[in-house]
Amino acid sequence: MSTPLIAGTGPSAVRQLISNAVQNDPVSGNFRCRRDIFTDAALFDYEMKYIFEQNWVFLAHESQVANPDDYLVSNIGRQPVIITRNKAGDVSAVINACSHRGAELCRRKQGNRSTFTCQFHGWTFSNTGKLLKVKDGQDDNYPEGFNVDGSHDLTRIPSFANYRGFLFGSMNPDACPIEEHLGGSKAILDQVIDQTPGELEVLRGSSSYIYDGNWKLQIENGADGYHVGSVHWNYVATIGRRDRTSDTIRTVDVTTWSKKNIGGTYTFEHGHMLLWTRLPNPEVRPVFARREELKARVGEEVADAIVNQTRNLCIYPNLYVMDQISTQIRVVRPISVDKTEVTIYCFAPRDESEEVRNARIRQYEDFFNVSGMGTPDDLEEFRACQSGYRGSAREWNDLSRGAPHWISGPDDNARRLGLAPLMSGARMEDEGLFVQQHTYWAETMLRGIEAEPKVFNVQPVEVAQ
């Protein structure tokens, strides 16, 4: 079986790699992706352009710039960005580089400033990007046409959107509406947001770490139910040994997820995907106390999912919203082909009690934090995979687990919740969601290449999968 994509017939190794990167063939039973898409440095440069800079990417949550003149720095691929809130309460985003000689303006992660002054030559800008003052800009130091009609203001992000507090940006001025980009994953994000009739907030503090591996390793792993019992066996065993009647941390019981087959996976448009499970002990989660209010506000079926199901939601290409052992926003920033930065935050309903907030944070620290029982395990596997991918003896990663029971379209759980996934995995260990995501990756990359015919000598062909 083959899917018509766009590829070239010229000598470009990058183009040829993308064209043959993914096999998604039910007839032959080949469901796999090439390992060198994780190691090719030339390919990485095009990923930054087509996957990150021309796509919508997550920038921040609006609670991180809650007050007038708050700012937070972020990235759209290789482009440094400042997200600001002005005195009128409006949130906007500009490139974090002085319009004079390109020096980075904001050199701290976040703060509160009504103006930004470049440390290099002293130019001053409003926090919405307008050039206010040029050092020694009077008299005849500059030509007559200098700073006309905003020519030297900071560069605004071409596309900027706020979906219910989640802020996204793109360097593509023709990016589709954010709701269209989110597609079917929007309903899952709504489940997270609707846990409170009020607002969510990102809690103070964050953790950032860099691992030695490609960015796609983390994007796969956040929805990989297959690795839990082997990589996180120590955490699973620890949970099994804990006395849940004592005053120790009470957390989600992960010991029965795989044994009882109480979960699955969904893939959505634009590379988004979901890993979900049914909770054996939902009473340990903070949202459990809101179940009656939720039923009245969002309906019994959705309330049941919010309270009794976990969610590992990937908003492709750089965001995970985790709602399981605790609640986490995980932001992925590629640095190079084999180096990736991850920044993690805990989020919560703004109106929850101190007791519930403390329990949430303890659960978060237990597994998610850099010093928790989960993160170090994953980072070692990312390093080991990246090292193994450098070998050339075997070219492919097998992604066929669960293929006999993958479902095209929604399963019963999805239909009950009004979801419309492209594909459903009947078990949480199923790997079909990675095949779908990498297929979208290849399609997006090849569409970008098609727009550069002079570079790639592009012609339409059939790309075997």
Swiss-Prot record:
This protein's pathway: Xenobiotic degradation; benzoate degradation via CoA ligation
SUPFAM superfamilies the record matches: Bet v1-like (SSF55961), ISP domain (SSF50022)
Cross-referenced InterPro entries: Rieske_2Fe-2S, Rieske_2Fe-2S_sf, Ring-hydroxy_dOase_2Fe2S_BS, Ring_hydroxy_dOase_asu_C_dom, Rng_hydr_dOase-A
Presence of the UniProt keyword Protein biosynthesis in the record: no
Disulphide bridges: none
Stretches assigned to coiled coil: none
Cofactor: [2Fe-2S] cluster; Fe(2+)
GO molecular function terms noted in the UniProt entry: 2 iron, 2 sulfur cluster binding; 2-chlorobenzoate 1,2-dioxygenase activity; iron ion binding
Co-factor binding comment: Binds 1 [2Fe-2S] cluster per subunit.
EC number: 1.14.12.13
GO biological process: benzoate catabolic process via CoA ligation
Reaction catalysed by this enzyme: a 2-halobenzoate + NADH + O2 + H(+) = a halide anion + catechol + CO2 + NAD(+)
Role summary: Component of 2-halobenzoate dioxygenase multicomponent enzyme system which catalyzes the incorporation of both atoms of molecular oxygen into 2-halobenzoate to form catechol.
Record text on subunit structure and interactions: Heterohexamer of 3 large (CbdA) subunits and 3 small (CbdB) subunits. The heterohexamer is part of 2-halobenzoate dioxygenase two component enzyme system. The other component is a NADH:acceptor reductase (CdbC).
Protein name as catalogued: 2-halobenzoate 1,2-dioxygenase large subunit
Gene, per the UniProt record: cbdA
